[in-house]
Amino acid sequence: MNIQEEIKKRRTFAIISHPDAGKTTITEQLLYFGGEIREAGTVKGKKTGTFAKSDWMDIEKQRGISVTSSVMQFDYDGKRVNILDTPGHEDFSEDTYRTLMAVDAAVMVVDSAKGIEAQTKKLFEVVKHRGIPVFTFMNKLDRDGREPLDLLQELEEILGIASYPMNWPIGMGKAFEGLYDLYNQRLELYKGDERFASLEDGDKLFGSNPFYEQVKDDIELLNEAGNEFSEEAILAGELTPVFFGSALTNFGVQTFLEIFLKFAPEPHGHKKTDGEIVDPYDKDFSGFVFKIQANMDPRHRDRIAFVRIVSGEFERGMSVNLPRTGKGAKLSNVTQFMAESRENVINAVAGDIIGVYDTGTYQVGDTLTVGKNKFEFEPLPTFTPEIFMKVSAKNVMKQKSFHKGIEQLVQEGAVQLYKNYQTGEYMLGAVGQLQFEVFKHRMEGEYNAEVVMSPMGKKTVRWIKPEDLDERMSSSRNILAKDRFDQPVFLFENDFALRWFADKYPDVELEEKM
């Protein structure tokens, strides 16, 4: 195997969107074209029992939302494609943000009837901060939506990114006739037996259709006043190519995939803590853990650490260094995924995502290296939780299951765990309420451990250096606790309590995460 050639073939990207914009449906269609599934499951068809292939966890199937990041791989047109399907629900932004550290590009799915929504904007900011290319898919043209020119304007005004349309819709909703493909200079037809037609046939096909007349006017306007196409600007994350289509009816998706693979970047390097960038073509293997997922197969109570390979080649059975612990590990049992199905990996290269079976060795953010290399990659973002719950086992006889469940789910990063310094009580912190619901559901369903949870409300969280800590600093306005790394932390009742503490202990430095 020529490793250089293999790395060049890799295209690793995440799909981001606001909930219900059609992200899971487009993922299904891409897998369909990659030959990974015989039929694309649709998220809406819940009563039929046909669930989306990429939504594999029980609670995701019930609620029609993605709450974990799935990793899926397929080959298409000479490229090896790695898709990371991210949680669309805002409470799961932590998992999503970490996933965005493991990709080289993003596909942003927008509901053409709703335009840019809150969660899309949040996720776009992270992508923009990383400077990776963004490809936009304006979805749901099979329904009535906003004017295409207005949607482009929103991209520029709300997200601050220039856009270039690769195709243009001819009507929408019941009047949807197809797409005017600007890149391939052809018509893509929504109705009838023929899939494509030449531009010259447009007048003959659509006659005096007012929508087609509007398309010609719009394109003339874009040619005169629109942005210029620039591959350089796309790769720099300054220009987003825009595709229109309908994921539900699988229209425009294959054209999008083919053009996307032409312009999406090959694997990037990754920055070490000293600022130096590790090149993907370095012969030495390196990678980092961006996600840990327990119970992908509930029958085996397993745990998988997802690793983005940054450089070199993975070979089954290889030994790696874990610089955080100073110890080594052997990578014998390694898999790649198609949602819940998996297959053993013999080798993989930079740009690939592999799943390493984990018995408690790894943490999110860990670096893996080989030989004399003991460097660490830049830390992944961590987040300060905003709401808290006390948690305990409902049945004292189930303490063992309770502790195992908490340990595994906390290591995934789905919730954060704190322990009251004085009482030893467990407290959970999360970015949003849904995280607690998922935690409770999974504790009961996967660990057979019912839990009692009582709200503590919002808290303002600050870490304190162990050497600065005096237990007498604890008061009725704060709770002194330890995080899961045994670092001391204060949970303040509100900002006033925090200011009161800062005034009382002016020499004590408190730290806030992201």
Swiss-Prot record:
CDD domains: RF3, RF3_III. Keywords: Cytoplasm, GTP-binding, Nucleotide-binding, Protein biosynthesis. It is found in: Cytoplasm. The keyword Disulfide bond does not apply. Residues 8-268 form the tr-type G domain. GO terms for cellular component: cytosol. Pfam families: EF-G_D2 (PF22042), GTP_EFTU (PF00009), RF3_C (PF16658). Disulfide bonds: none annotated. GTP binds at residues 17-24, 85-89, 139-142. SUPFAM superfamilies: EF-G C-terminal domain-like, P-loop containing nucleoside triphosphate hydrolases, Translation proteins. HAMAP family: Rel_fac_3. Increases the formation of ribosomal termination complexes and stimulates activities of RF-1 and RF-2. It binds guanine nucleotides and has strong preference for UGA stop codons. It may interact directly with the ribosome. The stimulation of RF-1 and RF-2 is significantly reduced by GTP and GDP, but not by GMP. This is Peptide chain release factor 3.
